[in-house]
Amino acid sequence: AYKLVLNQWLLSLFNVKRFEDLAEHLRNEALEGLDENNVHHFHHALTAQLFNLTQLPTELLLEYDQNIVRYTQRLNERRITRGEEPIVWKYFQYLTLLFTEIYLERYFSDPKTLLAGLNAQVAICNTDKLEPDQIAPFDEQAEAWPQLNKLAFWMATGSGKTLLMHANILQYQQYLEKYGRRRELNRILLLTPNEGLSQQHLREFETAAISAELFNKDGRGLFAGQAVEILDIHKLKDEMGDKTIAIDAFEGNNLVLVDEGHRGASGGEEGAWMRFRNALCEKGFSFEYSATFGQAVKGKP
């Protein structure tokens, strides 16, 4: 149910109620790519339809668009040098990145107000629900950011979630930098359900020219804290072993990326990996990506 709350809150900033109300203006494939000023056509299409947004003035949406252009150029540098196909975002990928910009800006600048906004949305969602079905609000007395430091993306297989993950890393680094917190980040960790997927991610990071390495428990590599460290979730345990790593070996301020994390967990392990994920990003942040755990939201990108 929380997924609906965040989704509905984001849509409310655009003065719409359904994702479709935004998407319908952007579906035309002719809108993919940039204009002569390096602004996404999507940006123009959105602001032409949705002007006078009090929460999202056009100049702010343009700032977010230019951030997205910058991340995309960074991810395309090596692709273009090698003569490979550059990334051109589809409308739903662009909206995902735009939503992430909006969320991260508010998370870093004013988490208390972000939490209050989400709670207002919870109250709206609860108006027509019986008590057992109501969503529990966030705790406004407790510190806000630890309640807000996890974002989950439900995306169909083949919808480019790896490309979005790469952009999300750059987005998170941009907002750490903007708010003077870059030095606080300990590690960037990518948790995968198996060794095969770890190797695949390593190759894809190489294509994007993002420093990455398979996690080595016997010593942090040369680029510790700079490189993404890729780790099979089954190697995380409570105790250190020959082939496993104790969860408390990691300090808490990490950016944690979880690819299909629950898919690698049998029933009994499910609670364990969630506990590990929470411990790893306790003082940091996590992005989670899955095609499967959002089947309740059928047919939505």
Region roles according to the model:
Residues 99-105, 162-182:
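Walker A/P-loop NTP-binding motif
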Residues 157:
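The conserved Walker
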Residues 1-85:
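Extended, charged/polar low-complexity intrinsically disordered regions
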Residues 163-167, 179-207:
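Conserved Walker A/P-loop ATP-binding site and its immediately adjacent core
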Residues 165-176, 234-301:
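Signature of the SF2 helicase/ATPase Hel1-core->accessory helical subdomain module
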Residues 206-241:
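Inter-Walker segment of RecA-like/P-loop motor cores
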Residues 146-148, 179-186, 224, 249-251, ...:
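Short helix-terminating capping/connector loops at secondary-structure junctions
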Residues 47-154:
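Conserved pre-motif I regulatory segment
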